[in-house]
């Protein structure tokens, strides 16, 4: 079958299609038969590269291009007030509740994730990084491990031979322990909901072409919006099978997009959170001193804003957003004084500029997305 390995193959671009019940619209928009349905509104389209190495200049709508997400800082999560939550008559220990973890995986062998009888708290684990038979997985890539398989591995002398899923960074394990780790009277530690069960998704890294599009250094980890949306879909599917209430937790975030909640993942999560028995928890508030954002009122006159870029930086991406129907233009000046000239926004378009002395190539894209106008700037070092 031509689409059998599309999700896990680097020979395909990935896009997020939005439709209203008629899936043929997505197939026609992206000229592909390779589609994975998320729900009645969103689907993932896999488009054969056919020799193309980048999506630059392909004129795909902004919201169809998956955003990249990174891991959020964990240093402020130690003091979460577990005792205060437990006080009075609430008795909140997570009994009967599932928590869906979307992160870097989990150390399933850790004793913090086993009940008193030795059984695992993990009801299902989808490792997107381990290639398996596409026909054996719910969403066509990765490998799924059931609670029975995990418990069989835990009884083995070599668990990793039976369930070879690891959390290399420890980020997902840390967060899972904080949320659902067992009480330890000797150390005084307890997860927030130690009796809760877990559904775990280990995200795969974003494909190289997508990291290149956002100027992300290959040595850094990033995760694609498509894989995150499918992770949410998977968690929903398992929770529905088990007939349990579910808390979907994402320890990841991004600076991209308008922050108005109009992106595909934003809207998908908002829709899930409206359902009875479903809650969504995301990270926030980790970048107060990082100066990653700037806002202001643009007057009729020019306004100068300086962007500091580190020496020998691999590249960077920056987005400018303004409310439609207002229009604005940008004029970018390099440290040596070379200017792009006025670049006026519009419905959609692109400009390519090379700063010779800085050995930098600048790509300026502009779109109109919903009720906002948007300019996306990407800069890369040239040889």
Predicted features by range, described:
Residues 264-277:
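Catalytic-core regions built around general acid/base machinery
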Residues 264, 311-313, 321-349:
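Acidic, Ser/Thr/Pro-rich low-complexity intrinsically disordered segments
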Residues 232-260, 283:
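Short acidic, glycine-rich surface-loop motifs adjacent to enzyme active sites
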Residues 2-98, 105-121:
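Autoinhibitory propeptides
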Residues 279-325:
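Solvent-exposed, flexible loop/coil segments flanking beta-strands in beta-rich domains
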Residues 87-224, 244, 325-326:
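Subtilisin-like serine protease catalytic core
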Residues 375-382:
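Conserved small/polar residues in nucleotide/adenosyl-binding loops
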Residues 105-107, 253-255, 285-289:
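Catalytic metal-binding/acid-base residues of hydrolase active sites
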